[in-house]
Design a protein with these regions (language model features):
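N-terminal Sec/SRP start-transfer signal
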Residues: 1-34, 44, 337
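Short helix-to-coil transition segments within interhelical loops
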Residues: 11, 323-330, 405, 414
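Internal alpha-helical transmembrane segments of multipass membrane proteins
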Residues: 23, 287-307
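Hydrophobic, regular-secondary-structure patches
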Residues: 36-111, 118-121, 135, 232-233, ...
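Hydrophobic secondary-structure segments that place a key small or acidic residue at a functional site
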Residues: 106-116, 126-210
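Mechanotransmission and gating elements of multispan inner-membrane complexes involved in transport
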Residues: 171-172, 180-286
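Transmembrane alpha-helical interface segments in multi-pass membrane proteins
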Residues: 296-299, 309, 316-362, 386-390, ...
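Conserved transmembrane alpha-helices of multi-pass membrane proteins
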Residues: 354, 366-400, 409-414
Length: 414
């Protein structure tokens, strides 16, 4: 029987002790790997949804809140900005493109976003069926919403004011579904897209604006940078929630936020800066959980150490006989060391499997995420090597004691 086979046999000879060591080691590794997977996954999701967006401009308030509401659609907007101010800003030579967003309404808990076709193009979205929304009270629905609510082309959607179910509705202004998007793995899967003009119409009520002395208010104006065609009256009186800006040059990153924040009612929010700040806030909790995982691994290493010491005491005559039958001191040393490494490998494998399986189940259960939870992070190799190192250190002292044991003294006491 070779050294490895003998080590495995000895490990399974003490099932309860070995199981305790494996479980402790596995749970410690699982905690650290789970945190690693979660943080990497969140960063990837954030980067995917913020792609192509250099700056978000909204009403004065928290920059982080503006980012969460306008990019990730998980917070309330800070307010509205006038269409006129937004249009003037997009004329700045530092702005390459701008996508308007009008937020605030929902349908059965899912957010309705007034925008232009440039918004789904930002995420390279495609249609599963039907067409893109138009200016006349039509809507294109995200894949997850269509699946969960059974929405199909031709259905009527009565929006609700606010972002929660049960809020006051706009029954007199229903949207007609004209298209369903393909799953994109982005925030679009959870959104209902309509035109900005449709949002204005929903909130205009039944009022008819009569401007006899100013008929030119109904003359159409093309806002090329915003991708909108509006009347002069709308340009002067309507609002939007935010703008998604693409810089024309790197210099804009320095100058444009300062220009925006210098105005009385506009706030610039940088996605990279605000998401980094968010991760710094989350990072404190991540560090605490990582420390917990490390403590559990150290405790498990202590368990391996104690198990090997106890095994050494119980098997001292067996080891002495092996020595008398020709086994070298080095072979005895390697036998005990290998037993510790086997426990470490089994525990680590259990921890990695538990972390990946648990994370995959968690991701699959989250309807707003279309990505797979089964992926591997390069830093997992560091966890693997670190776990193996801890296991080796926990095994060295028992192995050295076995190496130094006096076989003649042991056999004389038999």
């Amino acid at each position: 029987m070779n050294l490895f086979s003998l080590s495995i046999k000895n490990v399974f000879a003490k099932p309860l002790s070995s199981l305790l060591s494996v479980l402790l080691f596995g749970f410690g590794v699982a905690i650290i790997v789970s945190i690693l997977l979660t943080s990497t996954f969140l960063k990837n999701e954030i980067n995917k949804n913020a792609q192509g967006i250099d700056l978000v401009i909204g009403a004065k308030g928290s920059p982080l809140q503006i980012i969460l509401a306008s990019i990730f659609h998980i917070d309330f907007p800070t307010g509205n900005i006038s269409l006129s101010d937004a249009n003037n800003l997009t004329r700045n030579r530092l702005v390459a493109s701008a996508i308007p967003l009008s937020l605030g309404d929902s349908y059965q808990g899912y957010r309705i976003v007034g925008t232009t076709e440039a918004y789904p193009q930002l995420y390279e979205a495609s249609l599963a069926t039907g067409d893109w929304f138009g200016p006349e009270m039509t809507a294109t629905v995200g894949a997850t919403i269509a699946k969960n609510l059974g929405i199909k082309v031709g259905d009527q959607l009565e929006s609700a004011h606010g972002l929660s179910e049960g809020a006051g509705g706009h029954e007199e202004h229903p949207f007609t579904v004209v298209g369903i998007m393909e799953p994109s793995g982005s925030v679009l899967d959870q959104l209902i897209l309509v035109s900005v003009q449709s949002v204005w119409e929903v909130h205009s009520g039944h009022e008819e604006h009569d401007h006899e002395e100013g008929g030119d208010h109904h003359e159409l104006v093309s806002l090329d940078r915003l991708g909108l065609e509006v009347t002069k009256e709308q340009l002067e009186n309507e609002d939007i929630t935010s703008l998604l800006i693409k810089y024309r040059s790197p210099m804009a990153a320095v100058q444009l936020p300062r220009i925006v924040n210098g105005t009385s009612n506009l706030q610039a929010a940088s996605p990279p800066y605000e998401t980094a700040r968010l991760f710094n806030i989350i990072g404190v909790g991540v560090d605490v959980v990582n420390m917990l995982g490390l403590v559990i691994i150290i405790l498990s290493a202590t368990s391996v150490f104690i198990a090997l010491i106890n095994s050494l005491k119980e098997r001292k005559y067996e080891l002495a006989i092996m020595r008398s039958m020709g086994a070298s001191q080095l072979k005895i040393f390697l036998l005990i060391l290998t037993e510790g490494i086997v426990l470490t490998i089994i525990g680590s494998a259990f921890g990695f499997a538990l972390a990946h399986l648990g994370f995959a189940i968690l991701v699959d259960s989250m309807e707003q995420i279309q990505s797979s939870g089964m992926f591997f992070v390069f830093d997992e190799y560091k966890v693997m090597l670190g776990s193996l190192t801890v296991g080796i250190f926990a095994s060295i002292i028992p192995a050295f004691l076995a190496y130094k044991s006096d076989i003649s003294e042991t056999l004389s006491k038999a």
